[in-house]
Regions:
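A short, charged, amphipathic alpha-helix used as a generic interaction element across diverse proteins
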Residues: 20-42
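Residues that cap or initiate secondary-structure elements
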Residues: 12, 22, 64-66
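Short amphipathic beta-strand/extended segments with alternating polar/hydrophobic composition
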Residues: 15-20, 51-55
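Short, mixed-charge low-complexity intrinsically disordered segments
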Residues: 36-66
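Short aromatic-glycine-(Arg/Gly/Cys) micro-motifs in beta-strand/loop hairpins
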Residues: 1-12
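Short, mixed charged/polar active-site loops
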Residues: 12-14, 47
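Short acidic, gly/pro-rich beta-turn/loop elements at beta-sheet edges
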Residues: 14-16, 26, 60
């Protein structure tokens, strides 16, 4: 499982699952970035919404397994 690590300008952070494979995760992140560019709001994963004004950065990482 791959997840997006999101940091907001306020300093808070969160993670959201975005894909089973790296390719799927990269596609989901590209979609979110396209949404941000076109309307200022992007959906990262199934339940995380970010805005261009609040977002500092997003990076992909492989989810740690227990």
């Amino acid at each position: 499982m791959w997840q997006a690590y999101v940091r907001f300008k306020s300093g808070s952070t969160t993670r959201a699952d975005v894909g089973e494979t790296e390719e799927e995760a990269r596609g989901a992140l590209q979609d979110a970035m396209s949404q941000l560019k076109s309307n200022g709001i992007g959906i990262v994963g199934p339940n995380l919404v970010v805005t261009k004004d609040d977002l500092e950065f997003i990076k992909l990482e492989q989810k740690q397994r227990d």
